[in-house]
A protein has these predicted regions:
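Conserved small/polar residues in nucleotide/adenosyl-binding loops
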Residues: 1-6
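Beta-rich, blade/repeat-based domains predominating
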Residues: 7-21, 57-73, 106-137, 167-189, ...
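Beta-propeller domains
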Residues: 14, 19-21, 26-54
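Short loop/turn segments that connect beta-strands within the blades of beta-propeller domains
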Residues: 20, 36, 71, 82, ...
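Conserved beta-strand positions in repeat-built beta-propeller and related beta-rich domains
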Residues: 26-34, 77-81, 140-143, 182-183, ...
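A short loop-to-beta-strand structural motif that recurs across blades of beta-propeller domains
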Residues: 37-41, 85-87, 147-151, 189, ...
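Short loop/turn segments that connect beta-strands within beta-propeller blades
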Residues: 43-48, 90-94, 153-157, 204-208, ...
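Blade-level signature of beta-propeller repeat domains, shared across WD40, Kelch, NHL, RCC1
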Residues: 275-308
């Protein structure tokens, strides 16, 4: 996958998603000063560049999901740093709505709604990723700000929140990613990657804490296909989990080398094909292959083909 055929470049690649036509969408953080440069890039399933858009997220591009609603598909985008907003877009990049911090929650400094700046803290809004609820609406993780999970209806109206900063049993330290695990149809669960605690936390669909699953290396986000849960870990590997959240396989692991070698993130000459540096997001495509976006200086996307 390459954008060298276009006039654009990318920096730190953050998230990746696939639509029903197997087109690939990648968001990078970008640089705030490049105000006319896009944050979202679209490729065909062979990695050929198609188009780009989303300059409004430059310097803060982060979360990206494709969601089908009725007969249409939409992009949901979250942005942190100085942007501090989340949006619903068409697949061509037209904005349907954009929203800022939910002041109804009484969690945030009023500045987060009125005039966001690149300021961090537990009273700041730094949205990272989405999960979509089975009866409509969605959850939004404030993974770098207040550490809350917010619940919205299908129109983006804030309803409630749970979590916050704490010890890891219903509270978080960087709740970076999340997923609705509906592999048990009768009892869907919310799974949150509590990144700095190196765990997954499990909740019922109403947000009641159920369990903590340890043993990860900075888990960043989640995807699922069939009975397999996919967890990219910033600690240099991608894990596949069964219905009981037990590890089936770990792909591209380079944990020891990345931990013990300085500067790998910045030095492309130290990257190894098939080995990961810092997986920040991953998803299955329509063929069961896995796409991984990495938190490295010049961005990297890797495709792992399913063994058949």
């Amino acid at each position: 996958m390459c954008i060298r055929d276009s006039e654009y470049s990318w920096q730190t690649t953050h998230n990746i998603a696939v639509d029903s036509q197997n087109r690939i969408y990648v968001i990078h953080e970008g640089r705030q000063e490049l105000k006319d440069h896009p944050s979202i890039f679209v490729f065909d399933d062979q990695g050929k560049f198609i188009r780009a858009f989303g300059s409004q997220y430059q310097g803060g591009g982060h979360g990206l999901e494709v969601q089908r609603e009725g007969s249409e598909e939409f992009l949901y985008v979250s942005a942190y740093q100085q942007v501090k907003a989340f949006s619903k877009l068409t697949l061509d990049g037209d904005v349907i709505w954009t929203k800022r911090a939910p002041q109804e929650s009484k969690i945030y400094n009023q500045e987060e709604y009125d005039a966001p700046k690149k300021v961090w803290g537990r009273d700041r809004f730094m949205p990272t990723n989405f999960a979509f609820l089975p009866k409509g609406g969605f959850l939004l993780a404030d993974g770098y700000g207040a550490f809350h999970i917010h619940r919205y209806d299908q129109d983006g109206k804030w309803l409630s929140s749970f979590g916050g900063a704490g010890d890891g049993t219903g509270k978080f330290n960087t709740p970076h990613g999340l997923w609705i695990d509906d592999r048990d149809d009768a009892n869907p669960k919310i799974v949150v990657t509590d990144r700095a605690h190196n765990t997954l936390q499990i909740f019922d669909i109403d947000g009641k804490y159920l369990a903590t699953i340890p043993g990860f290396g900075l888990p960043a986000n989640i995807d699922c296909q069939g009975q397999v849960l996919l967890v990219p870990e910033l600690g240099a590997r991608v894990s596949l989990l069964d219905r009981e959240y037990k590890v089936l396989a770990q792909l591209g692991s380079d944990v020891e080398r990345i931990r013990d070698t300085k500067g790998v993130r910045e030095d492309e000459s130290l990257w190894i094909d098939g080995k990961f540096v810092h997986p920040h997001d991953a998803c299955f495509d329509r063929n069961g292959d896995i796409l991984v976006a990495e938190w490295v200086r010049t961005g990297r996307v890797t495709k792992l083909e399913r063994v058949r």
